Swiss-Prot record:
It catalyses: NAD(+) + (deoxyribonucleotide)n-3'-hydroxyl + 5'-phospho-(deoxyribonucleotide)m = (deoxyribonucleotide)n+m + AMP + beta-nicotinamide D-nucleotide. This is DNA ligase. DNA ligase that catalyzes the formation of phosphodiester linkages between 5'-phosphoryl and 3'-hydroxyl groups in double-stranded DNA using NAD as a coenzyme and as the energy source for the reaction. It is essential for DNA replication and repair of damaged DNA. InterPro entries: BRCT_dom, BRCT_dom_sf, DisA/LigA_HHH, DNA_ligase, DNA_ligase_AS, DNA_ligase_CS, DNAligase_adenylation, DNAligase_N. GO terms for cellular component: cytosol. Belongs to the NAD-dependent DNA ligase family. LigA subfamily. Zn(2+) binds at residues 428, 431, 446, 452. The lineage of its organism: Bacteria, Pseudomonadati, Pseudomonadota, Gammaproteobacteria, Moraxellales. One of its GO terms (biological process) is DNA repair. One of its GO terms (molecular function) is DNA binding. The active site is at 137 (n6-amp-lysine intermediate). The gene is ligA. Residues 613-691 form the BRCT domain. Transmembrane segments: none annotated.
Length: 691
């Protein structure tokens, strides 16, 4: 992966020798810089330092003295610039020039063959099966770096793929990330994408130091890397053992390079770290290499969670193109999910935002997929009965990728003799209100409503969440603290926190600057959309899609609040139960009072442009969309259907007019066929909407 390093040491450099001209000064600076960069790579990436700490410090001091004496000769890639800067007030949002798409996944050999077959089917019959390039799927944070005429100018996280956060100041502190590319000085704009990660040895060292200081440790290297990059104070990022590995060139690639493997070889030559690469010709060769990496995975210096397989030819990548969220020419071949056995010591009951009582299994802590798991959701009382799980049982816990761990098996033959079946609690574990399990429902519920502190807290957390009012920086821990200190009881109280700034500052670890940031974020959230506001209210049964449909259907909050059940039922995705729940919600005096207080505090939204469907081609029709579309994102397809008068629902029923099915259509396709619902392909859809 890297060439052997034979660095200079401080003994090889005469730091006391007088320097008499600019060329000699620059030569001396370059000697210091190159040696320090070699050490940084060996220390932070390979965890194999090539200098003693004292030698490193001496070289760094010598370079700093030269730079202070000759500021006009400071080199652009000097590691002196990689120690952190002033704390940032917040991260700026940046739109990617080219979206940073995610990858599809395959999990077994047959999936891999299907992926390669789909690639072949899309290519000309006359073409031979393409070569594929395989890379390690690094388990870190995806980042885009930009260089203008060789000089590093910007680093942006993936974010949602369209927009990310500007982390330039933190990225400058990554020791193996070049700040200057001499071989790219003639390239106007070079964009290199890759993964910021924390090597295993550095992660263990970081956690060991944190434990010694009785500070919080990180769960895994990925969390540590992501948390380090999102520090507002770059000096914190500078103190963390981060590394950057490049995996693509998105702008500025030389015209002479025509394959992905050649592109990675080039960016390695100009100064970037690149993971191992293998070129294969068919599924069997790919599987052989995949299995060889699994066998040696534990010996790698960093965490990986699979392989990335790409069509090697850049021209064929262009020909194959993209789905709405992922390329057709690449996929991630994930490693097998991990399943381990452990003991379930107890079952606790938690209360959710709408009163649902959820059982949580308390496990003997065990490592699954690189993460220590001590809790596992058991979903509901029906699931407990289905599994026949009891406190004291040995259970199998399964985790695949980032999926929440779950119990997949109970080892009944190892059950303790004195075990007893789990009983549904008759009263709420938080407020002692009666618990009910409605007929034909899986979830038991606390009847305490907003009298229940647990429901109050969960309602507050939901209200500020990213997809609701999106109040950045006001996390669950602070909200619970504010609640416990009596500063907020309802969501409307959040908009009165500016009146309690002195009290907020006195709370543990919350300084004036943090308080000011929270107040600013609250103020910024006042301008929202009607659909976000409806979703933020936390009406039972009203998710994001239903909130959007209600906003589109009524166009105005007052019209929605005064709507009858019959009118609510005209909204796509709103059935009898949801209509009744929404109707009762908007007539509860407490809810009316909170909504009024929110509006009086200045929460507002732009007018919703309603679609008048009468007379339009699809008036009266209900459509459902499933799978990935080639020509556009699903939200765009939804908008086009609505523009023609259709209602777009999220679920298939006998009332559905048609199902628009894209690539990888799943269970909705099977349900549509079972119910006799018409299935429309993408070409037919494009003809329908006139494209």
């Amino acid at each position: 992966m890297t060439d052997a390093i034979s660095p200079l040491t401080s003994k090889d450099i005469d730091t006391a020798k007088p320097i008499t001209n600019d060329d000699a000064i620059v030569t001396q600076m370059r000697t210091f810089i190159d040696t320090l960069k070699q050490h940084n790579y060996a220390y932070y990436v390979l965890d194999n330092p090539i200098l003693e700490d004292s030698e490193y410090d001496q070289l760094r001091r010598s370079l700093l003295e030269l730079e202070e004496e000759y500021p006009d000769l400071v080199q652009p890639d000097s590691p002196i610039n990689q120690v952190g800067d002033m704390p940032l007030p917040a991260f700026t949002q940046v739109t990617h020039d080219i979206p940073m798409l995610s990858l599809g996944n395959v999990f077994e050999y047959n999936d891999l063959r299907d992926f390669m077959r789909r690639v072949n089917d899309r290519l000309s019959v006359a073409q031979q099966s393409p070569e594929y390039e395989m890379e390690l799927k690094l388990d870190g944070l995806a980042v885009s770096l930009k260089y203008v005429h060789g000089k590093f100018t910007q680093a942006v996280t993936r974010g949602d793929g369209q927009t990310g956060e500007d982390i330039t100041q933190n990225a400058k502190t990554i020791r193996n990330m070049p700040l200057w590319l001499a071989d790219a000085a003639d390239i106007e704009l070079l964009e290199v994408r890759g993964e910021v990660l924390m090597p295993k040895a550095g992660f263990e060292r970081l956690n060991r130091l944190a434990a010694e200081k009785e500070e919080k440790t990180f769960a895994n290297p990925r969390n540590a890397a992501a948390g380090s990059l999102r520090q507002l104070d770059p000096s914190v990022a500078a103190s963390r053992p981060l590394a950057f590995y490049a995996y693509s060139v998105n702008q500025g690639l030389l015209d002479t390079i025509d394959t992905q493997s050649a592109a990675l070889a080039w960016i390695k030559d100009i100064g970037f770290s690149v993971s191992a690469v293998e070129v294969v010709s068919n599924p069997r060769e790919a599987q052989t290499y995949y299995e060889s990496i699994i066998a040696t995975r534990a010996d790698l210096p960093f965490e990986i969670d699979g392989m990335v397989i790409k069509v090697n030819s850049l021209a064929l990548q262009q020909q194959l193109g993209f789905l709405s969220r992922e390329p057709r020419w690449a996929t991630a071949y994930k490693f097998p999910a991990e399943t381990v056995m452990t003991r379930l010591h107890a079952i606790d009951w938690q209360v959710g935002r709408t009163g649902q009582i959820t059982p949580v299994g308390k496990l003997e802590p065990v490592k699954v997929g690189g993460v220590t798991v001590s809790n596992v959701t058991l979903h509901n009382f029906g699931e407990i009965q289905r599994l026949d799980v009891r406190a004291g049982d040995m259970v199998s816990v399964h985790r695949a990728g980032d999926v929440i761990p779950k119990v997949t098996r109970v080892w009944h033959e190892q059950r303790p003799e004195n075990s007893e079946p789990v009983q549904l609690p008759s009263t709420c574990p938080v407020c002692d209100s009666p618990v009910v399990l409605p007929k034909d429902e899986a979830l038991a519920r606390c009847t305490g409503g907003l009298f229940c502190p647990a429901q109050q807290q969960e309602a507050l957390i939901h209200f500020v969440s990213r997809r609701a009012m999106d109040i950045d920086g006001l996390g669950a821990s602070w909200l619970i603290s504010f609640f416990e200190h009596g500063l907020v009881k309802t969501v409307a109280d959040i908009y009165q926190l500016h009146n309690h700034q002195e009290e907020l500052v006195t709370l543990e670890k919350l300084g004036e600057k943090s308080v000011q940031n929270i107040i600013s974020a609250i103020e910024a959230s006042k301008h929202t959309t009607l659909s976000r506001f409806i979703y933020a209210l936390g009406i039972r049964g009203v998710g994001e899609t239903t909130a959007q449909n209600l906003a589109q259907q009524f166009g105005d909050l007052d019209a929605l609040m005064s709507a009858s059940i019959e009118k609510l039922l005209l909204t796509p995705d709103v059935g009898a139960i949801t209509a009744e729940l929404a109707y009762k919600f908007f007539r509860a005096p407490h809810n009316i009072e909170v909504i009024t207080a929110l509006r009086e505090a200045g929460v507002h939204w732009d007018k919703v442009e309603q679609v008048v469907s009468e007379g339009l081609p699809l008036d009266g029709q209900t459509w459902v969309i499933t799978g990935a579309l080639d020509s556009m994102a699903r939200d765009e397809a939804k908008a086009k259907l609505q523009a023609l008068g259709a209602k777009v629902s999220g679920s298939i029923s006998a009332k559905t007019t048609a199902l628009l099915a894209g690539d990888k259509a799943g269970s909705k396709m099977a349900k549509a066929e079972k119910l006799g619902v018409k299935v429309v392909g993408e070409e037919e859809f494009l003809a329908l909407v006139g494209e």
